[in-house]
Structure formats: structure tokens, C-alpha cells
Amino acid sequence: VTTQDIVGKLWKLCDVLRDDGITYHQYVTELTYILFLKMAKETGAEDSIPAGYRWDDLAALDGIELKKFYRQLLEYLGTECQGRIREIYNGASTSIDEPANLKKLITSIDELDWFSAKEEGLGNLYEGLLEKNANEKKSGAGQYFTPRPLIDVMTKLVKPQAGEKCNDPACGTFGFMIAAFQYVYSHTNGFMDLDGDQAQFEYEKAFTGCELVHDTHRLALMNAMLHEIEGRIMLGDTLSPLGKNLDGYDVVLTNPPFGTKKGGERASRDDLDVLTSNKQLNFLQHIYKSLKKDGKARAAVVLPDNVLFADGDGAKIRANLMDKCNLHTILRLPTGIFYAQGVKTNVLFFTRGTSDKDNTREVWFYDLRTNMPSFGKTNPLKQEHFADFMKAYEAEDRTKVEDERWSVVSRAEIAAKGDSLDLGLIKDDSIVDYEDLPDPLTAAENAADTLEEAVDMLRAVAKELKQLGV
């Protein structure tokens, strides 16, 4: 039994709950509450859960008693417990109305092959569920899932080292930090090359994040816990004053959310160089501010095309970035890997300088977009798609790389173009600006209206056919 099989079974259970009108995202959250108790039992970690509120206590009940106890359990764990458990269950409520559905969910989870699941790693199992959820629900609240192959490529090229502080200021379900943890783990012989204090630092302090959306924050905590990572994951907005304290990092890996701040207001940070309502530009400013000023601290960040072209504030922020950091590489990503087919994104790789001036001399571009297939559900992005880019990136002498997708532009040429980074590329006319994307709620309401109209028309046709005796 593979992780995929178990994920498939857990996912099928969602159909049971569709009758209760539960969305996929609510299902994953609900599943997290129940899975947590089962996984604690399976891994011998039940001591951290108060007696009377454990898996067996839940599994023993049914009917209205079960429903009542489950609600009580959620509230108790979210208020009376300490640490991670309290964070995961804080403010938890259930969307399951029908006790029989809740019982079916508990029974089905109990019947899964937990021996195989443990062999494969419970963390992998949970990440599989999160990925499935992301594919079912590509957009919404500006949240989306970064494809694992892209996370792995970015992590491999940034090369986090033991002893370094790594952070994701918009951490979603914590995928980047888990990849960074696994990278360090595998490059230190499972931390065996480190002494006790060093290994403890990796587990407890090296990998941290911040997430704005409460439900997503829960999933991040659960994901981290299943991978034995105890680093702090804050619930809050990096672009609020809270973000000022997120600094002194050696490595930042992130894919900040799409869209503008609600209502287009400016970030409430007073320490950013340029005040703008463009969320990605604010995240970019936060990231280069949050790196240690030591000539080694580095970041890889997924950003939309408008960050490369926006004039005014955008040009100022890019000039700042190129002054304070060596922006050495930009990877133009193919389309279709995020929720909206037309949305175009890039990965910016940069290293913080020791000074605040003239750190970028030239920028290398790799165009992985032009003449590439569009990726999506039927054509998923895989790590091999990045092989040529990785070869060019890691080349000892970048000028000797023979690849038509690889080009370099000097800082002077960039300045001559008003600090636009729309250079060295085949012009593509289908650029979508994030500001022009419809608000997810409006888009959903419009779609619902259209479907209702279609249903009404079909009913009218059926009625007419009936009258005609067809």
C-alpha cells in the first residue's frame, strides 16, 4: 500500500461529507482534527493529549453522543491544552452536521493501513492530502499551492546549510520549510554529522514561517509536526507591524500570495523603503530587508510578471533590490502551474550584499516559458523540466553555457530601460496583470449565476418538450 493509495482513500471519504455541503478545504481541515488524534495514537504520542480526549474516546461513541463529544473535544483541545495542540485546535469548529457521516469518517480512518502509512512517513501522507486539496481548488483567498518539483528545485539551488536560519514569510502549508529541513537532513547524514545542540537547533529553531489565514496556519502546524519540525510558525500578516521582527535570516524561500491588499490599502509597515498597495512588491521589500547583511544570506522567491515591469514604485523597489542584493538569476516559469492559466510567474534568486549599493552587476535570465507546453492537471510539472536550467544555474562559468534560453543583461542596460527587468526575452503579448484578475468571490458568484441561468433554460426546454409530447 503506497501513500498515494491511502491519500486516495482519504480523499474518497470527502464524498461522504459532500451531503453536508462541505468544501474540499473544510474537509482537509476537518480531517486534520480527526487525523491528529489517530496519528498521535499510532506514533505513541498520546501523552500530550489529555486523557478522556483521545482517539479511543472518540471512536467508542456514535449517534448524537458522538457529535456532542466531538464538538466538546474540539473546544477543550483548543482552550485547555498547551503548545502545538492548542494552536492546531484553537477556534476549531466542525462543519459536519450528520453524526452518521462523522462516524463513517472515524471508522474509515481507523480501517486504513497505518503500518504502511508509518513506513512511508505520516508527513508524506499529509502532504499528499494537501496537494490533492490544492489541485481540486486552485484559487481562493489568494492562497495556492506551490508544485513540489518547483519547491525542490528552488531549495536545491539555494542550498540551506546546517546552522542557518530559514524562513518563509507567507508559508502556506509550510512546504518550502519542510523541503529545506529535508535538504539539510539528507546532507548531514540524518543530522548524525551534527552534535546534540546543533541537531536540536535544526528541529526547534532553524525553520520558521508566518501565515495569515487561520485554517491554512493549522495545516502548516500539523504538517510541520508530522515532519518533527518544532520551529515557530506565526499566525499573522507579514505586511503588518508584526513582520518587522521577522529578520536576521540566512535563507528565505517563499511564494507570496497573489493580489492586492484588501481595498488596495498600503501595507501598515513603516519600515519599508517604498509604500505601495502592491502586495508582491511589499513582500519583495520585506524579504530583502529580512536577510542578514553578510554577503551570504540568500533568497529564492516566486513573483508575478508585474513585479518585473511595474513602473513608479515598482522601478524604485527593483532599483533598491539591485542595490542591496546581487539579483543574479531570474527564471521565467512556464504558464499553467498556478491557478489561473494566463498568470505568468518567475523565480528571483538573490544574495544580500554587505553594503547597500551596487550589488548587482548583471542578471542572468532563463526563459522556461517560451515554446514550452502549458502545464496543468493533465500535464503536471516534473523535476526533469528544470534539468537544463539547473545545469546553467550551477555552471562554473555561466558564459560558456550553450542554451538559447539562457541570456545575461548588464546592470547598465537594465538602468537604461528604466530598471525594467523585461529584458532578454521573446516578447509575449498575453501578459495578465494580477490587479486585473477578478476577485475570487465575484468570480464564484458570477459562475454560480451563469450555471443557474443554464439550469433554468434547460428546465424550460424540458417543459416545452414535455408539452410537445416528445
What is the predicted function of each stretch?
Residues V1-A162, R232-G243, R332-G336, N359-G376, ...:
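Non-catalytic, mostly N-terminal accessory regions of nucleic-acid modification and defense proteins
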Residues W11, Q200, E228-I233, G263-A267, ...:
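Short acidic (Asp/Glu) and glycine-rich catalytic loops that position anionic groups and cofactors
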Residues Y27, L212-H217, S277-F350:
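Conserved Class I SAM-dependent methyltransferase catalytic core
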Residues A40, T351-S355:
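Short loop segments at secondary-structure junctions
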Residues G140-T254, G259-K261, D270, L275-S277, ...:
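Conserved S-adenosyl-L-methionine
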Residues Y203, G248, V252, V343-K344, ...:
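A generic structural signal for well-ordered coil/turn residues at beta-strand boundaries
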Residues L242-K244, G259-K262, F309-G312, Y339-G342, ...:
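Switch/connector loops and helix/strand junctions flanking conserved nucleotide-binding motifs
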Residues V343-V347, G376, F386:
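Short hydrophobic/aromatic beta-strand or adjacent loop that forms the aromatic wall/cage
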